């Protein structure tokens, strides 16, 4: 199971930037909406997306592979790509994250 942002439909333009740790090491990729805000963080085995608090709580209760986001904090979730959550669900969450991020000022 492999998540590829290039296969994500239903979103507009975005840019990609390398995500570095505090030590300057490659940690993953940041995907940025046109308003210069991150909507997705992709690491080797996880992705992080922006959600609302209610959805975040529901997903964490429903799936063992979903936890609070390290990048977004309580405003997002981090999903371990273990196969517990379907790829379609993950693409839906990424779409939602993009749309929520676009609405931010």
In which residue ranges do the predicted regions lie?
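Charge-dense, helix-prone N-terminal extensions
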Residues: 1-105
């Amino acid at each position: 199971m492999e998540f590829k942002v290039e296969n994500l439909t239903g979103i507009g333009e975005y840019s990609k930037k390398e995500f570095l740790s505090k030590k300057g090491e490659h940690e993953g990729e940041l995907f940025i909406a046109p308003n210069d805000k991150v909507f997705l963080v992709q690491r080797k085995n996880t992705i992080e997306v922006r959600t609302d608090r209610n959805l975040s709580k529901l997903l964490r209760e429903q799936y063992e592979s979903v936890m609070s986001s390290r990048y977004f904090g309580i405003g997002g979730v981090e999903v371990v790509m273990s196969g517990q959550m379907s790829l379609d669900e993950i693409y839906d969450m990424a779409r939602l994250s993009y749309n929520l991020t676009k609405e931010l000022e």
